[in-house]
């Protein structure tokens, strides 16, 4: 009989744990946070881990607490994520991300004719919509284009 073994990720002393990330989105979360091989602190992540509500991803980042802008970006691709702030190996704060009603300069409009994609100095602006069936979608306030499946690929 095979013995069941659990894979454990080392606890972090100070930093952030992002839990309940939509399965398969951990690498996009790292991209949103601009974490690359040049980042010198410890970063660990698990993708497609079994959870009580199905599969999920988890990201742990030593020595970093997230800004409101970073939380808003994560909410766009993973609206059910939770953020745990860790200090001295203890969770001192636990919050769910909050999906903003409006984002500016965060996502590129996919409509090549949109004024926000021209040489004009105009930031993209989207209203944020959430439905249980379709998840998150963004509605461009300039050209009316709707983005739903491609949000992660168009983050600025």
UniProtKB/Swiss-Prot annotation:
Binds 1 zinc ion per subunit. One of its GO terms (molecular function) is metal ion binding. SUPFAM superfamilies: Aspartate carbamoyltransferase, Regulatory-chain, C-terminal domain, Aspartate carbamoyltransferase, Regulatory-chain, N-terminal domain. Keywords: Metal-binding, Pyrimidine biosynthesis, Zinc. Its cofactor is Zn(2+). Involved in allosteric regulation of aspartate carbamoyltransferase. This is Aspartate carbamoyltransferase regulatory chain.
């Amino acid at each position: 009989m095979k013995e069941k073994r659990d894979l454990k990720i080392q606890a972090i002393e100070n930093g952030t744990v992002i839990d309940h990330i939509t399965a398969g989105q951990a690498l996009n979360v790292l991209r949103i946070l601009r974490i690359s091989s040049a980042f010198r602190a410890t970063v660990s992540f698990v993708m497609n881990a079994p959870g009580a509500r199905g599969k999920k991803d988890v990201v742990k980042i030593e020595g970093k607490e997230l800004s409101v802008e970073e939380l808003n970006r994560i909410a766009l691709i993973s609206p059910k994520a939770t953020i745990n702030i860790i200090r001295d190996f203890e969770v001192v704060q636990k919050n769910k991300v909050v999906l903003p009603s409006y984002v500016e300069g965060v996502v590129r409009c996919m409509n090549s004719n949109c004024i926000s994609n021209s040489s004009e100095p105009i930031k993209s602006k989207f209203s944020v919509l959430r439905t249980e069936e379709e998840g998150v979608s963004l509605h461009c306030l300039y050209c009316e284009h709707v983005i739903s499946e491609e949000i992660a690929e168009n983050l600025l």
